[in-house]
Amino acid sequence: MDEDLNHNLFFKTIKFKFPKIFNTIESKCYTLCIPQSPSLYRMNITQKIVESHVFIESKYYQSEYETLNKESNYIIDNGYIMEKENNNKKVKIMFDELCYNKDYKSYRLICIEEPLTGGASGLNSSISRSESDLGDLLITQGIVKPQRPTFDQATQFFLLDSISTNINTIVFRKANQQLEEFERLHSINSKTDVDFFRKDLLLIHNRLMDDLVCANADFKQLHSNEKQMNSLSLILESYILGKIQNKLYGDLKRLYEKENQHLYEKMIYLSKLSFEDIGVKSDFEPHLTKAKEVIESFNTGINYINNNNNNNNNNNNNNNNNYNNNNNNNNNNNNNNNINNNINNNINNINSNNNNNNNNINNNNNNNNNNNNNNNNNNNNNNNEIIITPMDKLLSIVQGSREIEESIKARAILELADEDDILTITGDDALPLTAYLLIHARPKYLATDLAYCSKFILTDIFNSSYGYHLVNLIAAIDYIKSLDILSPTKTTTSSNNSRNTSPTSSTTNITYGGNSESLFAQSSVNNSTISSPKQPEDEAALFNNLKKSLSTMNLNPPQQSQQQQQQQQQQQQQQQESNFYSNNNNNNNNKTFNNSIPPHFISNQNSNNNNQFTSTPNLFNNNNNNTNSNNSNNNNNNNQHNSRYSTMSFSTNISNNTNISNKYVKAPAVISLDDDSDNLGDFIGKLRDMRDDEVIVSTHFK
């Protein structure tokens, strides 16, 4: 199906940006060559390029044309356009259309496969791109949008590649003065200052945006298109934030210093968890290799700043070394001269020449070494990608997600998988995937990066895919905060080491949720001198410190195994049977209860054993004088069991003289005694037979 030329970027640019050229084509019935839309990728449409695509037919030769700028001659033959001087260069004609002007005279539009001049080098024009993808790469009317809005690309766009460079230079000279004054007067000392800092910075951005649109006629034509204005705003934002990056990011690092340390320590623990523990499906594991490499660039901007500082230090050290070497050489020369004062002048001259030669050789070697060091440092800087703007950090997350999608597509094509069997990234998968990539990247200033991206992306991006990835980044960091710190294997190992006789801990993770921050706060208070761990021993020390802080918390008791529950039930049954037959001999003893013990401190297995004939629950098992040794052991076991899960210390020991009996051997017999005297004999007989049992006598008088 042929392309609709009314939506072609090249054709629209000629009509709106170069109307004089288009009127000339219509009025004089020239031929216009229009490259197809996929071939316009990264093409800067200038007036010279437009004139090279306007053909004027020769008066003397058929099918021979001259361009409007008089620079080239072309021949149209057998569906191709060829240069007259070079027949090897051919451009295929896709289709042509015949149009009419207001005087009903015809002129010709030819759609060609690729531009005759000015196209992107090395671009395969056969690669088709949808119109939406093209809109993300280009701003209409000939203004190219940088693929990655870094500070360098924004500077090149406004001050180097733009047609109206002189006008933009005047605007940005004024903007640089405003930014220097802003950087001198503003600082971030508290979290409330962040909003004021952003508000004032947004005013500068909007004012500079208005100045550019008013001063530049090319930008003024974009004012009616919101999407194009957002793209221009994004480039301008990269320039502004690149200018004040050192000031802004440095203040945010100091403000979120504790949060950065807490998140960094937590990510070290979480990096040892499996995919399932973090919530990532194991199917995504083979598709995360390139994504991890992309997310590693999340800290590159910080490394770049550090490298610059290191280079300055290296240069200073090299200069100092040269100065010291020269001083040493001069001292050696003076010493040699003093020693050789008694020797003739010829020998002195020879020695001085040798010393000078040696000094020159040493100095040359030092200079060569310094040059090599500087070259190595420069090479290292060139290899590091500079990440400065918040938008550039966000694009690292976007690129990581795209790498996963591309890996899934490539594997599906390789395995010839059906569409229903292809792995897809849903909204539920994107959150843990982003969290997993951040955990393994271990950014040292993650809390700062969160504030940097969420607060200082000045352009409205929430109606685009960038907005989705920003929300996903914020949610992923919150997800990291809510994840369990301890892996299942560590939880079981630590519990077994601390209590050899304790029941086996459940291997399910305990999610602390909102208490995760307080956990790290306790750890940082107890270990204020702790540093960022870099070795396995440091990580183990951090883990032990964290385990100590967990011991002060009241956690729910882990579930016991079935074998241990059965053993406890058998012990309870044996103890109850021994108490059933010993209570009758001790009915007259004093009975005291320790009512101060709350029932919820007793184990769950014992708290539900209520007597079926009384309303008082059995808080703990009875002690009998005949079974003191057995019962004391059981009580000690119960005390140990209770102390595992209780943060309060209390005593459940009962003296030997105290016997607790609140159980009947069997249900008491009830004898009804009425006012009828005939039943008195029966009552006495029954009472004589049941003298050893508990008896309740009820009376009812008519």
Curated annotation (Swiss-Prot):
Q: Does the keyword S-adenosyl-L-methionine apply?
A: no
Query: What cellular component GO annotations does this protein have?
Result: early endosome; late endosome; plasma membrane; transport vesicle; tubular endosome
Kindly provide the name given to this protein in its UniProt entry. Putative uncharacterized protein DDB_G0284213
Q: Quick check: keyword GTP-binding in the entry?
A: no
Q: Which organism is it from?
A: Dictyostelium discoideum (Social amoeba)
The residues forming the signal peptide are none
* UniProt feature, compositional bias: Low complexity: 306-384, 488-511, 559-590, 603-612, 621-639
- The VPS9 domain, residue ranges: 337-489
Q: Which domain of life is it from?
A: Eukaryota
Q: Which residues form a coiled coil?
A: none
Disordered as annotated region, ranges: 306-385, 488-513, 551-645
